[in-house]
Amino acid sequence: MTPRIESEESAPLVNKNNNNNNDNNNNNNVDEENPLIIESGIPIEDLEQKNKPYLIKVPNIDKPDSKWINFKTLWAFTGPGFLMSIAYLDPGNLESDIQAGAMAGYQLLWVLFWSTVIGFWLQMLASRLGVVTGKHLAEHCREQYPKTPRLLLWLMTELAIIGSDIQEVIGTAIALQILSNGHIPLWAGVLFTAADTFTFLFLEKYGIRKLEAFFCSLIAIMAISFGVEYIISKPDQIEVVKGVFIPLCSQNNISQAVGILGAVVMPHNIYLHSALVQSREIDRKSETQVKIANKYNRLESAFALIISFIINLLLVSVFAKGFYGETTEIGLSSAADFLMDKYGKVAKYIWAIGLFSAGQCSTMTGTYSGQFVMEGFLKLKIAPWKRLLITRCTAIVPAMVVAILSTSHLDSLDQWLNILQSIQLPFAVVPVLLFTSSEKIMGSKFKNHWLNNQFVRFLSLLIIAINIYLIITFSMQISESAWMISIVSISFFFYFIFIVYLSMGQENFNSMTKKIKNLFNNNSNQTYNNINY
């Protein structure tokens, strides 16, 4: 069944038959639909100047792309993909890498690889949506869904962002404790993260390119740190290759495998990427320019995610080599001591530097995600520092409670937050698939190919199936009582119904429920008549 989209406001400007109408709509909707582009949190109407300082000009974008790769053009598009890839390297990912290596050895490297491939596929849908339409995913959700489901979808997305932010707070606090030799307690590190993030907002004043370069340097620090750990630990290269290409997973390691998927493919990152790609200046009425933008965004994102995969692979391999079969309790908070005992004091501090860089990187991208999501869903303009204050304070409360009362539960909290991301993932995957499949939104030349649709639908069903397993496992771990199983079952029922609604749209969903109701009524009447007869 082809989903029906309720609004035609989002039709892309590359649709040649509607250029004039679209130009008018675009001019009329600037103030309402695009309150923020990228820089310094200034509304777009205040930035409408000739030189458009909030957009980055792309050389040769108006000419047909004669080369397979024009490196000047690629350089101009370099940035959004690396900012997007930071979510693949946040403290939640590092926690997942540690658990996978220590609990399963090299066996789950194939899960890491295919999770990254899946992530790339989904990020390309988000990127194409932003480039073709000039609107990001949250804005399309506001236009296409009615108020109540839209608000519920916003709450689910905010929950994912807050969950990720808790991991960033915990990761940074642990890194500070290690680097200070324990002189900075966890609770103080948690408070520190509430303040240090605001310094990044000042970088925006120097231009988006400076901000992108700064975060690329933090990614480089992570690569060097974990690369040194890899050299020190000397993992078995043959086992690493086998782990990437030979799929193995015992029943005991299913939770680690799901944790990898939840850590790598994060829902809020799909919303973020659809907005970041709009920082490059293109004419969306030009089919050539849109194609060039899609091509170079794809190349840059692929390169960035290859780097993120290598960094994660290095970390899994380090802990597989050193700790597989030797320990059952290891995480962000205890990894440094294990590394020091195994490889010396230098390994401990190198690990802390990499962890600190991961926490700082993901902090700012989380802020951007929250900003775009709030403005897109609620049409609410809010200064970045206010948005950061709200999100960070919300994340600090649970992190502070755990840091003060039970530091031993930090790693367990991180693992469950990764699983939370997996459960929330359909709330980003389903809308981006729906919108990029729509000819009304994407145009006939940029909508998804049918094969692409089938693949992403398969991924959605796979994610839902995994989440069913997680929910059942979680309920059995908490309690085997009938009331707990009932609560979990009811929760999952509404979870599944909401996903079905999002995938169909309101009109198709109402039509389906009406048919089911009529079928039920007809069967009831027939049964009643048979009894009377």
UniProtKB/Swiss-Prot annotation:
Transmembrane segment boundaries: 69-89, 102-122, 159-179, 183-203, 213-233, 257-277, 303-323, 349-368, 388-408, 416-436, 458-478, 482-502
Start and end residues of each stretch annotated as Disordered: 1-33
Gene this chain is encoded by: nramp1
Compartmental location: Membrane
Record topology, Cytoplasmic segments: 1-68, 123-158, 204-212, 278-302, 369-387, 437-457, 503-533
Listed PANTHER family: NATURAL RESISTANCE-ASSOCIATED MACROPHAGE PROTEIN 2, SOLUTE CARRIER PROTEIN FAMILY 11 MEMBER
Originating species: Dictyostelium discoideum
Topological relation to the membrane, as annotated: Multi-pass membrane protein
InterPro entries (UniProt xref): NRAMP_fam
Chief subcellular location: membrane
UniProt-recorded name of the protein: Metal transporter nramp1 homolog
Signal peptide span: none
Glycan-linked positions: 253
Extracellular compartment segments: 90-101, 180-182, 234-256, 324-348, 409-415, 479-481
GO biological process: defense response to bacterium; iron ion transmembrane transport; manganese ion transport; phagocytosis; response to bacterium; response to imidacloprid
